[in-house]
Amino acid sequence: MFLLLKPLLSLHDLSLNLLSVMFHGETLKASVDGVGINMSTMWRETRNVFIVPLFKCIVVMCLIISLLVFVESVYMNLVVLYVKLFNRKPEKVYKWEAMQEDMELGHQNYPMVLVQIPMYNEREVFELSIGAACRLTWPSDRLIVQVLDDSTDPAIMELVSMECTKWASKDININYERRENRNGYKAGALKHGMRHSYVKQCQYLAIFDADFQPEPDYLQRAIPFLIHNPEVALVQARWRFVNANTCLMTRMQEMSLNYHFMAEQQSGSTRHAFFGFNGTAGVWRMVAMEEAGGWKDRTTVEDMDLAVRVGLLGWKFIFVNDLEVKSELPSQFKAFRFQQHRWSCGPANLIRKMTMEIIHNKRVKIWKKFYVIYSFFFLRKIVVHFFTYFFYCVILPTSVFLPEVNIPNWSTIYVPSVITLLSAIATPRSFYLVIFWVLFENVMAMHRTKGTLIGLFEGGRVNEWVVTEKLGDTLNTKLLPQNGRLPKRVNLKEMMMGIYILCCACYDFAFGNAFLYLYLFMQATAFLISGVGFVGT
């Protein structure tokens, strides 16, 4: 602030001379001189007594958090290394035997499986998901496909209904279900689907979002885990992305999600038999779901809500890293921002509602409760977002104006470098994009922080649900053109952050000596590019 006032104060002599000429007096000049000196003194005292000590305290907190994040990242990757070195794949840890048809019973030894496909105005992808579900290699008399259509567009409703009729004519047991309203969004649709009488005969439930395409042998590989291990409630597959090469933004998403599955899901499954259900590409044991109370629509992360409640009952989860399901990444920046808002707001709101329930739980050991509260929720779903945004996008840039505050190199270079490398190894083919990925993740941390705050304090958008826009098979579908009108493309939050960091970079370039401007110029560019809408397709 003083630096901004200094140029103005330096002009006061000129103004005073003019005033002296006009009023022929020296008293006014002396008064204004005194005011300028007093303002300068007050600012220096405020800066030294309040601002600098407060900033130092914030930096210390950030350093502690950076160590916690570092330890968590190293721990998860050590678990992944352990799985690889000692071949601790789920097939080796849990009993698994391939499904075989009984000569006497025929298909009767196959359990009844319900496949749910929730959708909402999914014109581009509904054929892909319905077709993939109907092609699953499972006895047709032991499989029920349920299409839960919440579409509001009559034309799309008709298309989805016709697609279901087409597969029904091929002796596929498929049911097209609609409801009168969209209460509860996806959770409400799933809950409504479970009320139908034919569902009661099913033992297992497989869920696929409208853009997911399971391979034909998906059930053959997943169901045996549930059949031969009665303590297991969930088998989760990883996602494989059909449009990862569409643009740079989808490559960045692929890197983030690959790390999520490789490190977070695999370590949770290996060490604690618990992780967050990804909402799709998973198979549930119906008994476990019913025991936990089924689907609830109190948050926008009904999948995580169900997983936590089932896990607190003592059920185990299995993540199968080499069981992949094709899916689509949002390729438009607006759609991606809405998705990230939901994925950050929902968990924060859920931990607000479930903290005491987890603490008072008597069914699981204290270490598992600690893992769920600290690692699963607090560190990964809340603290990481705040830390990434405030430390790398606010604290570091602002520190150039406060040379008295020393931020050690290990916190700005060594620790983030190790964390970045550990994250990047999940997607070796994109290793050369790691710098772009870090800068983009910092930009998105701003939106995730905002979503987390809304979830924690139940702000106005806490239950906002915007269905992620899909484009279908990007190899055969023309990409939607970016809106050419600048006002509709501009994102003011990103622009403001970019301008602020750019100012900090310029100041550090002119007066600093730590070369922090090298990072600040790159981060400012990332914010500004996002701000003018040149991200995605």
UniProtKB/Swiss-Prot annotation:
Substrate binds at residues 209, 211. It comes from the Eukaryota. Pfam families: Glyco_trans_2_3. One of its GO terms (cellular component) is Golgi membrane. Its EC number is 2.4.1.32. It is an enzyme of class 2 (transferase). The chain crosses the membrane at residues 50-70, 382-402, 418-438, 494-514, 515-535. CDD domains: CESA_CaSu_A2 (cd06437). InterPro entries: Glyco_trans_2-like, Nucleotide-diphossugar_trans. It is a multi-pass membrane protein. Its main location: Golgi. It is found in: Golgi apparatus membrane. The active site is at 150, 303. Belongs to the glycosyltransferase 2 family. Plant cellulose synthase-like A subfamily. This is Probable glucomannan 4-beta-mannosyltransferase 15.
